[in-house]
């Protein structure tokens, strides 16, 4: 059967495999493409091909990630798989590969291991909306042990505020599915059905409230002030009221013009690089780092909690640890803002390569909500990355 050209008829969902090292994440990824390829819904990807994941850079951090795509009857999926544990942490914290849901792979022979717990915690911290579990290697695990592992997993998921009692747990063998064993192939299809039905369809960026970070500001004589940037979410139309949020006190304005590539438009939407003209705003009142947003949808803050990853020396990060009250720059969307870091109780210092929760206080307020990603920089050099997990004030 000839592969059909990819048509945008099915909803698109981003997922990934997470879990402890050697529990079978990459084997499962290969098995999914193998089983779906037989139905003409994926291109076959070999284990070795997925395992040699290319390196990518996101917010100045190098991450190895393999991207695989496939479809089911209901959806089109982009699936990510990371070779190393550190790659997962970096991926989840930088949001390099945004996950609408994840497949947690746990070996029935081992049960939950340290990285299983760590990945569940991270998924909670960075708000991965839903998890589905694949209990792997059940062909070589003791059936009584499998029952215990399942109970233990449900407790662990509940501990991190996932609905442990309701999460689908599919049992199978990724390796046997790769070898074409019919029963194991059926388990892969069962897993895909669970992913289809249990992982919610994401809200598209266009359907979210309007937000555009300002990258540049200039004035057009006789017409007013223009802010340019890439529209992050939503839709904006001429005549609509917006709020200008961050750095200075929040103020309202009305959009009097929208331009893209020198052409005037009546509306702009998520993904567009646009110039927006504002009524009654002076050039001095707008600056890079502010955001233009639908009124009442986002507020400016200076204090927040965050989950951060600090780069290793080999990754171009710091060579030395840092201590309480460390003051780097935090790069949010389009600008750097200095802030002070408060370490959790009992933590004396942070070493390059560490991943932990911290509290940050910025010197000026920035428009933020939970899940906002940022880079940690020192003089323009990236030394870490983070995700806002809770706003304090």
Curated annotation (Swiss-Prot):
The segments labelled G1 in the record are 19-26
Looking up HAMAP family in the UniProt record yields: EF_Tu_B
Q: Is Cytoplasm included in the keywords of this UniProt record?
A: yes
**Reaction catalysed by this chain?**
GTP + H2O = GDP + phosphate + H(+)
Q: Which protein is depicted? A: Elongation factor Tu
Record note on quaternary structure: Monomer.
* Binding-site residues for Mg(2+), renumbered to this chain: 26
- List the GO terms this entry assigns under cellular component, sorted alphabetically: cytosol
Q: Give the signal peptide, or none.
A: none
Q: Where is this region: G3?
A: 81-84
For this protein, what is any one GO molecular function term? GTP binding
User: Residues annotated as region G5?
Assistant: 173-175
Which stretches of sequence are listed as region G4?
Answer: 136-139
Question: What top-level branch of life does the organism fall under?
Answer: Bacteria
* tr-type G domain mapped to chain residues: 10-203
Q: Which InterPro entries match?
A: EF-Tu_GTP-bd (IPR041709), EF-Tu_GTPase (IPR050055), EFTu-like_2 (IPR004161), EFTU_2 (IPR033720), G_TR_CS (IPR031157), P-loop_NTPase (IPR027417), Small_GTP-bd (IPR005225), T_Tr_GTP-bd_dom (IPR000795)
**Residues where GTP binds:** 19-26, 81-85, 136-139
EC? 3.6.5.3
**So what does this one do?**
GTP hydrolase that promotes the GTP-dependent binding of aminoacyl-tRNA to the A-site of ribosomes during protein biosynthesis.
């Amino acid at each position: 059967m000839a592969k059909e050209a990819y048509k945008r008829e099915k909803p698109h969902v981003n997922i990934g495999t997470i879990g402890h090292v050697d529990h079978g994440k990459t084997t499962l990824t290969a098995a999914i493409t193998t089983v779906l390829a037989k139905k003409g819904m994926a291109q076959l990807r070999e284990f070795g091909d997925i395992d040699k994941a290319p390196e990518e850079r996101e917010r100045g951090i190098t991450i190895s990630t393999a991207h695989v795509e496939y479809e089911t009857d209901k959806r089109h999926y982009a699936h990510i798989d990371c070779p190393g544990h550190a790659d997962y942490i970096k991926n989840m914290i930088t949001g390099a590969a945004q996950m609408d849901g994840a497949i947690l792979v746990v070996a029935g022979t081992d049960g939950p291991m340290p990285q299983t717990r760590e990945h569940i915690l991270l998924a909670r911290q960075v708000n991965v909306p839903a998890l589905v579990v694949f209990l792997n290697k059940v062909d070589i695990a003791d059936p009584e042990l499998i029952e215990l592992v399942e109970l233990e997993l449900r407790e662990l998921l509940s501990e991190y505020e996932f609905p442990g009692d309701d999460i689908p747990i599919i049992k199978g063998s990724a390796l046997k599915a790769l070898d074409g064993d019919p029963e194991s192939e059926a388990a892969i299809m069962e897993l895909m059905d669970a992913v289809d039905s249990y992982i919610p369809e994401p809200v598209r960026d266009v359907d979210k409230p309007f937000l555009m970070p300002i990258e540049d500001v200039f004035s057009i004589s006789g017409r007013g002030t223009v802010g340019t940037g890439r529209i992050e979410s939503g839709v904006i139309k001429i005549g609509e009221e917006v709020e200008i949020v961050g750095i200075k006190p929040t103020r309202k304005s009305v959009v009097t013009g929208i331009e893209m590539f020198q052409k005037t438009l009546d509306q702009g939407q998520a993904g567009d690089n646009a110039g927006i003209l504002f009524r009654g705003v002076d050039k001095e009142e707008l600056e890079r780092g502010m955001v233009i947003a639908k009124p009442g949808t986002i507020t400016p803050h200076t204090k927040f909690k965050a989950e951060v990853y600090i780069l290793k020396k080999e990754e171009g990060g710091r060579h030395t640890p840092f201590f309480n009250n460390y003051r780097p720059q935090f790069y949010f969307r389009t600008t750097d803002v200095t802030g002070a870091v408060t370490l959790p109780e009992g933590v004396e210092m942070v070493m390059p390569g560490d991943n932990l929760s911290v509290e940050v206080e910025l010197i000026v307020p920035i428009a933020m909500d939970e899940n906002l990603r940022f880079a940690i920089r020192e003089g323009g050099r990236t030394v870490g990355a983070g995700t806002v997990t809770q706003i304090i004030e």
